[in-house]
């Protein structure tokens, strides 16, 4: 799928090459989020920021190798885009990494941070933190077969294995034996039992200073920080200590914060994306998807928070929530919802 003129108009910049270097884009990224960062969401977020590195939802190696659907599908406009893999079999991960590189992904990320039960049962996610050698083997197997970056997203500890020494040993093993050069650190530990994934994102306390210390102790590694970051001001404060910042829920629930990322984080001279123009720039994509059988609500559910903090935001959200799922719903639903915002502006 190729870019449309609306998208090019919004994302015009002379400072960055057409396919942004992933190391540069890693200064600011949107986290992989299950059920949220699907291809429709990523297309939408790309209209708000040209440079932000976007991540897929976690995709398991089993789904890619044995699944019937195309779990690697994405639009060319999404670049730079990284694939997050879930798995713990080095050979299967290597196979999937090769497929992903052939499809044009800019980075492969291994999930060593998700604490959900269904993930643990498949022996991947945060439970892998307890087996640093296996994580190293997985990363090395992927690095041996691809030339794009292979990164690891992890936590600062699991259960009672939460000492700084444990974290350093993990990073040491995965960077040394696994040759991993880039880590994204969620600044909380994970409880592998007793807490839901949602609770694991909220209850374990954030420890940003520990992540800063990790970067100081491993200056040769590229490290991004993740967890509880709610504004670009906070992101810029973290960038005083870290190579990159990854934002999760806030970028999804209040995507308008991405509109200023290119200027504030990447130094672009472009004007910030206008939310109304972004909605209308979605129309060609939406019409193409509708013609292929996608329901409007599957796309617009990612756009509900766009006008957060702007008069009319509640009416926008409510109208889309009540009408986008109806049979025959098309871009007229969005046009009507936009009028509700415009009337309040």
Curated annotation (Swiss-Prot):
Active site at which residues?
Answer: 114
Broad EC category = oxidoreductase
Q: Which UniProt keywords apply?
A: Flavoprotein, FMN, NADP, Oxidoreductase, RNA-binding, tRNA processing, tRNA-binding
Essential cofactor(s)? FMN
Describe the disruption phenotype. Answer: A dusA dusB dusC triple mutant exhibits a complete lack of 5,6-dihydrouridine modification in cellular tRNA, whereas each single mutant exhibits a partial reduction, compared to wild type. Cells lacking this gene can introduce D modification at neither 20 or 20a in tRNA.
Question: Residue numbers for the site described as Interacts with tRNA?
Answer: 111, 198, 201, 314, 317
Q: Which reaction does it catalyse?
A: 5,6-dihydrouridine(20) in tRNA + NADP(+) = uridine(20) in tRNA + NADPH + H(+); 5,6-dihydrouridine(20) in tRNA + NAD(+) = uridine(20) in tRNA + NADH + H(+); 5,6-dihydrouridine(20a) in tRNA + NADP(+) = uridine(20a) in tRNA + NADPH + H(+); 5,6-dihydrouridine(20a) in tRNA + NAD(+) = uridine(20a) in tRNA + NADH + H(+)
- Write out the residues that bind FMN: 32-34, 84, 153, 186, 226-228, 248-249
Task: Extract one GO molecular function annotation from the record.
Answer: tRNA binding
- Which cellular components does GO assign to this protein? cytosol
Lineage, top-rank taxon, reads Bacteria
The record's listing under InterPro entries reads: Aldolase_TIM, DUS-like_FMN-bd, DUS_fam, DusA, tRNA_hU_synthase_CS
This chain's function reads:
Catalyzes the synthesis of 5,6-dihydrouridine (D), a modified base found in the D-loop of most tRNAs, via the reduction of the C5-C6 double bond in target uridines. Specifically modifies U20 and U20a in tRNAs.
User: What's this protein's family per the entry?
Assistant: Belongs to the Dus family. DusA subfamily.
| NCBIfam families on file | PRK11815.1, yjbN
Please state what the protein is called: tRNA-dihydrouridine(20/20a) synthase
